[in-house]
């Protein structure tokens, strides 16, 4: 069997959720959209269900997967419903839905629902992605109340630059939110992972931790609370070939790396088809049998090369950590000029192995 594996530490996951909940000062929906950022939504939700206040997913398909697996905790649809017909499924499966557009308000007004639903009413405070316009927000709230079809409303927005700790944008968005929700008697939800970790002064009854659950920092700088996160996924494979190369020999496609001295090269069964970033450059860190080393040359579809020169004991079958407890996913992502969110979500073709250790 091909040796590529992703080991998922469920105890670390629970630790990170508890840190999110304690740091936010309120309730927390564990965000498990995109297959729990590549970690496996069903297994993640099962591991957290006894602890979590609920879950958040992108769409109804993801919610129904959780319900089919027996998850009974609240599940919020972060993008809401895409068609009015989905309201029947929302009622049937006891889901919560975001409402971010006036057509969704109209759909609820016109629908015949078997019981009242929970709505998270989204305000566009400056990200300009989805959400009611500020001047529509109060009216939208009143329209929902007037339907008699809504059991509860939570007021929400989303920060666009909370990962930039020196930016004033989050304070500006908070000011917009407070202005246009004034007088509305409802719980609020503002905090995503960077807001939970970096903006403790922002009030929020509900938080929505995502990337922090999986042990990756949302920041590009050291942060004391983020440093308490524990990596959940360890991506590993093994060396399947060893080469001794003299000075001047190229490594991999395009000869982007040429040996500047005699080098011992290991070929690892891992490539961009598995989700390892193709644009990770020479020098991206790896661990080989617990010893630090580096990536060499261009990442191929199914293989990549590492430097064994300073790890003389390594050879065929040696364990290689691509990211995890020793090699942080955030560092790999930074080297590849992307973010840990993307490299986690890109994981595929790699079996996941779950443990409680």
UniProtKB/Swiss-Prot annotation:
Q: Name one Pfam family in it.
A: Ala_racemase_C
What are the binding positions for substrate in this chain? 129, 301
- Cystine connections: none
| Positions where N6-(pyridoxal phosphate)lysine occurs in the chain | 33
InterPro entries noted in UniProt:
Ala_racemase, Ala_racemase/Decarboxylase_C, Ala_racemase_C, Ala_racemase_N, Ala_racemase_pyridoxalP-BS, PLP-binding_barrel
Q: Which domain of life is it from?
A: Bacteria
Q: Copy the pathway line from the protein's UniProt record.
A: Amino-acid biosynthesis; D-alanine biosynthesis; D-alanine from L-alanine: step 1/1
Q: Which GO terms describe its molecular function?
A: alanine racemase activity; pyridoxal phosphate binding
Name a GO CC annotation attached to this entry: cytosol
Q: Which reaction does it catalyse?
A: L-alanine = D-alanine
**Catalytic machinery residues:** 33 (proton acceptor), 253 (proton acceptor)
Q: Name one GO biological process term.
A: D-alanine biosynthetic process
EC number(s) for this protein?
A: 5.1.1.1
Named cofactor requirement(s):
pyridoxal 5'-phosphate
User: Does this entry carry the keyword Isomerase?
Assistant: yes
Keyword annotations for this protein? Isomerase, Pyridoxal phosphate
Q: Which SMART domains match?
A: Ala_racemase_C (SM01005)
User: What EC class does the entry list?
Assistant: isomerase
User: What biological function has been recorded for the protein in this entry?
Assistant: Catalyzes the interconversion of L-alanine and D-alanine. May also act on other amino acids.
Q: Which PANTHER family match?
A: ALANINE RACEMASE, ALANINE RACEMASE, CATABOLIC-RELATED
NCBIfam families, per database record: alr
Q: Which family does it belong to?
A: Belongs to the alanine racemase family.
Q: What is this protein called?
A: Alanine racemase
| Upper lineage | Bacteria, Pseudomonadati, Pseudomonadota, Gammaproteobacteria, Pseudomonadales
């Amino acid at each position: 069997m091909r040796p590529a594996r992703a080991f998922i530490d469920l105890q670390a996951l629970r630790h990170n959720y508890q840190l999110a909940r304690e740091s936010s000062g309120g309730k927390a929906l564990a965000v498990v959209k995109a297959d729990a950022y590549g970690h496996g939504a069903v297994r993640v939700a099962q591991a957290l269900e006894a602890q979590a206040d609920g879950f958040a997913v992108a769409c109804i398909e993801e919610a129904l997967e959780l319900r089919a697996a027996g998850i009974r905790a609240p599940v919020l649809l972060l993008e809401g419903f895409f068609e009015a017909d989905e309201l029947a499924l929302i009622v049937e499966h006891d889901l919560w839905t975001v409402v971010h557009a006036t057509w969704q308000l109209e759909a609820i007004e016109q629908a015949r629902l078997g019981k009242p639903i929970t709505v998270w009413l989204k305000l566009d405070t400056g990200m300009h992605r989805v959400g009611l316009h500020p001047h529509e927000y109060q009216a939208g709230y009143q329209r929902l109340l007037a339907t008699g079809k809504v059991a509860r409303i939570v007021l929400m927005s989303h920060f666009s630059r909370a990962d930039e700790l020196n930016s004033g944008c989050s304070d500006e968005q908070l000011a917009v939110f407070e202005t246009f929700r004034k007088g509305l008697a409802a719980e609020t939800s503002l905090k995503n992972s960077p807001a939970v970790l970096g903006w403790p002064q922002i009030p929020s009854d509900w938080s929505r931790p995502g990337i922090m659950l999986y042990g990756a920092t949302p920041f590009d700088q050291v942060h004391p609370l983020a440093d308490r996160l524990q990596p959940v996924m360890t991506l590993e494979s093994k060396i399947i070939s060893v080469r001794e190369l003299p000075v001047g020999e190229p490594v991999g496609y395009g000869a982007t790396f040429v040996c500047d001295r005699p080098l011992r090269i290991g070929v690892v069964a891992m490539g961009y088809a598995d989700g390892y970033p193709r644009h990770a450059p020479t020098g991206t860190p790896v661990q080989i049998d617990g010893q630090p080393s580096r990536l060499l040359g261009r990442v191929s579809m199914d293989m990549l090369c590492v430097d064994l020169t300073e790890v003389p004991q390594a050879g065929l079958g040696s364990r290689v950590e691509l990211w995890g407890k020793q090699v942080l996913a955030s560092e790999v992502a930074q080297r590849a000029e992307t973010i840990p969110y993307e490299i986690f979500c890109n994981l595929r073709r790699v079996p996941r192995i779950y443990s409680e250790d």
